Every structure is written in structure tokens, then in C-alpha cells.
Amino acid sequence: MNTLENTIGNTPLVKLQRMGPDNGSEIWVKLEGNNPAGSVKDRAALSMIVQAEKRGEIKPGDVLIEATSGNTGIALAMIAALKGYRMKLLMPDNMSQERRAAMRAYGAELILVTKEQGMEGARDLALEMAERGEGKLLDQFNNPDNPYAHYTTTGPEIWQQTDGCITHFVSSMGTTGTITGVSRFLREQVKAVTIVGLQPEEGSSIPGIRRWPAEYMPGIFNAQLVDQVLDLHQREAENTMRELAVREGIFCGVSSGGAVAGAIRVAQANPGAVVVAIICDRGDRYLSTGVFGEESYSQGAGI
């Protein structure tokens, strides 16, 4: 039977035509905005709920709790609506209005913490709520069902779509579920693939990408699965995001711009490489933030 959850995954992989170095390298991007709730997080959201159901930990009608910066919350709200769960989502109040509206549209209850509390504060409050018995904490940051989704779907799709020719995989790091799961799969293949993670520079803020304090580093992260970590400035991520729209026709979010900025760096340093990056979501979730505003384009940013 073809249900909404069956439409998650098997997203297109397309080659950039006008961006990237002229050194024989190729940059391919996986368009995760094509998932039904609009982001790569659809995969992890489905996995966390389905696997918990299989273990008998949750059943329709239960309350689920999660801390999110946006995309995971939207994806979980969609799956919760589909399967009959009540969803409580905790998020910093500086996240975009589009993301808040999407979560509420799916029927989720949204609980905001301050910008100063940030994702760390949202995670702490989600844990407190679960400990008080207010619902089941899915805990994407420490839940192995998160990277398992990418080990069983995203990684195999990339390998198949590149005919095994991929040489480098580049991914932004938030929960680290995508990079952990994809890397684990690629490590098991017959050829070496270099895994590159991306994080914000010290003092820089990029939605969807985190530079975690040691005490908040996601428990699912395995540093041995990442060969290199690149630091990105917010300006570089935003400029690349705008350039993707103007030059490649790919309308995406800031973290995706960061991923492609990192992929371009990797391609420049490795002539002949086949580099794959993740386009995490769509740009329409960021319109209210002003990153696509006329001022940015009038200043030549990203064009």
C-alpha cells in the first residue's frame, strides 16, 4: 500500500552545473527538500517513531516530546499526525516563523525557550518534561534510530546513485545523525570515501549546524567516522545558499548553503574528486529571516 511514509527517501541526486572548480572534480547534491515534510529530517523522524513502535515503547495516542531547531520538529509533527500521536516540541524562539507555523499546522504543541537558552535549554527542558512523565522523549541527539535511518536509506541511495564513484561525502553537523549513518554505510563499502563534517566558526551562528559544547555533544556522534571537520562562517553559508538559487536553480536553506560551500572547498583541494553534499531542506522556510532579502542581492552577496 502506498502511504505517505512510503514517499520518504529515494530523493534525487543532481550534479551542479555552474558552481565548483574547473579541475575535473564533480559536485553532486542530494535534494532532501523533496521529502514530504520538506527536509532530510523526515528520514530520522520516521525511523525514531517506527522503531520505538516495534520495541513496544510507544503506541498511537501517546504524547511524544522532542527538542528541535525546526526541521526535525516539522518531520515529527507530520509523522505524529499520520500515526495518531500527540507531539510536544521545544524550540528556541529565534527560529523562523515558517518553521513554527509548519509544526502547528500539523497539530503539534510548540513550547518556546529563549534565544539565550538556545538548543541546550530546549534539550534540558525536554528531558525534564519526560522525567515528570509528560510524554516519551524521542531524543534525536542520543537516539541510535536517528543515524540508523541514514545507514539504511541515505547512504545506500548515495552509493547506488553515484555507481560507487563517490570519493568525498560532505555534511553539516547538527544532531550528527546524517553524517554518522551515511559514514558508517560508506565505510563498509569496498573503496575508501573521505567524510567531511561542517560546523560554524567560533562565534558564528548557522541555523541547523551546531558547534556543540563538550557536555552537549550528541551521544550518537562517533568522531572516528569523520575524517575532517571544516569551520564555516555564517556569511559564507548564506552567500552560497543565494548563489545556489541564482546559478543552479536550487532554492534551499542556510545549512545547505554551508554544505555546498564545504563541498566546493573539498572539490578545489581534490582535482578529479566526486563530492556529494546534502541539500537539507528548502529555502521557503527562511524567507521571513531576510536572508533572501533585496539588500543581500543589491550588495552582490552570493551572486
Positions of PLM-derived features:
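PLP-dependent amino-acid enzyme catalytic core
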Residues: 1-303
